[in-house]
Amino acid sequence: MSNLLVFDNSVVTDEALVANIMAQNQGASHQLLERIGTQVQLPANTYASIQVFTKSPQPVTLPASLLETLSGALAPGGALFGAVDGSQVMDFIMAGLAQDGDKWVKPAATGTTLLKKSGGGPKKFAFKRASPATAAPSTNGTNPAATVNLNSVVTLSMDDDDLMDEDDLMEDDTNLSMPIKIPAKCDPGPGKKRRKACKDCTCGLKEMEEQAKDAQLAAQNTVTLSAEDTAEIDFTVQGKTGGCGSCALGDAFRCDGCPYLGLPPFKPGEAVSIGGASDL
């Protein structure tokens, strides 16, 4: 890998300075800073080092795009240094360079190792009963060897993949509908008002209260019709009206099942004959 010398305009105007720099870096390539990226394209991953030169006492501020070009031209592990502006820390980092003293180094590529699985499927762990053994004696030799109690060893195996159905853990519906037995301490006795269930009631009193409340709501939602409500409505009597209230106005205002379909309009209280028979 070769080295690259980058000169700005202030350096190339001094031929003696250029000759001196080239003599100290024999075999190195050189480019004009202002031509890189516009008129000259640098090869990628080629240079072991890139050194920037200027005659100005101030360091050279490199644009972010030029930094990316120089970083791409560096070989992995190569360094950029010289008259560069060290305050451009974020620009150097964004270009993929890491600071190493007064140099900015392109990190070397690291290989990736893929781990291969052995076997076709996932392994299952099994814990088997330990064989009779004795513990090692202590280093001071005062404690006797302790024997392993085989009765206390638990054998676990993950080969059994059977899962328990959670529905099997529930009792039958017949058991859920069994009457709730209230403990004696929660029963106030005959003639006394029963107290309310506790917040964290476990004796069944809370369930009884909920059942009573549900029964009360069901009774409230039941509609009971009296004989007056279910009596057949006589549309010829003053004040009596049907569901639509328009039977006396004629067929245009009568329902499909109205018994007066086909009859002319009539006045309330008027005797109306249906099928030759009077309704009086």
From Swiss-Prot:
Cofactor(s) required for function per UniProt: [2Fe-2S] cluster; [4Fe-4S] cluster
Motif (Cx2C motif 2): 255-258
GO biological process: cellular response to oxidative stress; iron-sulfur cluster assembly; negative regulation of hydrogen peroxide-mediated programmed cell death; negative regulation of nitric oxide biosynthetic process
Any one GO MF annotation of this record: metal ion binding
UniProt GO cellular component terms: cytoplasm; cytosolic [4Fe-4S] assembly targeting complex; mitochondrial intermembrane space
Keywords (A to Z) from UniProt: 2Fe-2S, 4Fe-4S, Cytoplasm, Iron, Iron-sulfur, Metal-binding, Mitochondrion
Binding site for [4Fe-4S] cluster: C244, C247, C255, C258
Keyword Hydrolase among UniProt keywords: no
Predominant localisation class: cytoplasm
Localisation: Cytoplasm; Mitochondrion intermembrane space
Chain segments annotated as transmembrane: none
Motif (Cx2C motif 1): 244-247
Region of interest: Fe-S binding site A: 186-203
Binding-site list for [2Fe-2S] cluster: C186, C198, C201, C203
HAMAP family: Anamorsin (MF_03115)
Quaternary structure annotation from Swiss-Prot or TrEMBL: Monomer. Interacts with TAH18. Interacts with MIA40.
Domain notes for this protein: The C-terminal domain binds 2 Fe-S clusters but is otherwise mostly in an intrinsically disordered conformation. The N-terminal domain has structural similarity with S-adenosyl-L-methionine-dependent methyltransferases, but does not bind S-adenosyl-L-methionine. It is required for correct assembly of the 2 Fe-S clusters.
Name this polypeptide is given: Fe-S cluster assembly protein DRE2
Taxonomic lineage of the native organism: Eukaryota, Fungi, Dikarya, Ascomycota, Saccharomycotina
